[in-house]
């Protein structure tokens, strides 16, 4: 995966061509009869997307996601509200453009020659490859040549259909597949791990995120090379919306916003460790329930799930953990640090968590105010691991090497240099295991992503089970209850033991469409 890197050569050429073609209408906000004017008159930017961990998601009713955040900032740039419509699959997205129900599609869509025949692309902002996936333990195909429609299913509107057709015509004449008109790629990947489907195809970023929650999903082979991802708008003679998008993305690049968004959503790395992820998720089921109340109790300024991820990275949630260097306990505190925090027993889980939070808060308070709010925690965690003085050195080294010392993306690239003599010999505080601090923060981010996604999945399953129970045992009137034998006691037994003990706070509906006003 190539991360959020805007293709500025492409933008520059396109901007020049647009400037020549549109010079009578520039500035784009100066005309009354154009798409931008219509959007501003309406007071809202209508964006259609799909529900994925990367593009658009919700936690506790609050929307987030790479495409959502970019779309929200673009709406702010235009001075209008953002209206998001969530569709079930890609075909429905393009229907919105065809029917005039959307101004833009922001859903991690791949640029290809077929799509640009009918729709206008925007700037490309990262790239993906299309990959065939299967379930660990099942047969792994090494080629597409013998796959049949009974084995391979893809989502409607998926860009890979064009690639499959080309491969069938040129290389694999026996290749066949089917399209499921009712399911998106995420749902098809779920079918694969549940054993309902042998294979499906999804993009490399979606697969990487899915594996954080479902490590049993594996990549069999690449179907395509890297393909650029972009937004799409209607193809017509009015290019004012394209001009506005170019202005917007250029401004985002110049002020560093794009780099921060890259780090936020794609900066956790794309390497996947099956064994480590599976071990972590087992611990979520078996160990976390006993510790969750403590994490929730002491997580004040950070999400309790992030605190849990920190503790897992430190000790794998083992209150008795001890390292050769003398650090001990759930949060692996040194003896001196524990004493300074008033901790009398480092192996007591509650004391250790309380002390770890206080120490992390101390690191957070030292991070300069010039660091963006949503990146301060990563600076603090690196300082938690290697000491704040070495974090100062890392920032100084970043500035000396023409990076931004307030950007975590820039600083983390320099952390490994703190253990290399040509660099640490010239720094104030000398040698540090910067490579370990780098890995420390990256691992915590991966555990946090897995934990959030896994808990969401569990709550979704509980919700679906409750809904199924309601369908199996519909409400009946007292009169009907007297007339017919009804398994009421069975209903109470199942409800109290399984379903009513779960009170889901995160609901993820994938039926039809949903509209959100922001």
Curated annotation (Swiss-Prot):
Residues 270-518 are annotated as: LT domain. It is an enzyme of class 4 (lyase). It holds the Pfam family SBP_bac_3. Residues 22-269 are annotated as: Non-LT domain. Keywords: Cell outer membrane, Cell wall biogenesis/degradation, Lyase, Membrane, Signal. It catalyses: Exolytic cleavage of the (1->4)-beta-glycosidic linkage between N-acetylmuramic acid (MurNAc) and N-acetylglucosamine (GlcNAc) residues in peptidoglycan, from either the reducing or the non-reducing ends of the peptidoglycan chains, with concomitant formation of a 1,6-anhydrobond in the MurNAc residue. GO terms for biological process: cell wall macromolecule catabolic process; cell wall organization; peptidoglycan catabolic process. The active site is at residue 314. One of its GO terms (cellular component) is cell outer membrane. Its EC number is 4.2.2.n1. Residues 1-21 form the signal peptide. InterPro entries: Lysozyme-like_dom_sf, MltF, Solute-binding_3/MltF_N, Transglyc_AS, Transglycosylase_SLT_dom_1. Disulfide bonds: none annotated. Its main location: membrane. GO terms for molecular function: peptidoglycan lytic transglycosylase activity. NCBIfam families: PRK10859.1. Murein-degrading enzyme that degrades murein glycan strands and insoluble, high-molecular weight murein sacculi, with the concomitant formation of a 1,6-anhydromuramoyl product. Lytic transglycosylases (LTs) play an integral role in the metabolism of the peptidoglycan (PG) sacculus. Their lytic action creates space within the PG sacculus to allow for its expansion as well as for the insertion of various structures such as secretion systems and flagella. In the N-terminal section; belongs to the bacterial solute-binding protein 3 family. In the C-terminal section; belongs to the transglycosylase Slt family. This is Membrane-bound lytic murein transglycosylase F. It comes from Shigella dysenteriae serotype 1 (strain Sd197). The lineage of its organism: Bacteria, Pseudomonadati, Pseudomonadota, Gammaproteobacteria, Enterobacterales. The gene is mltF.
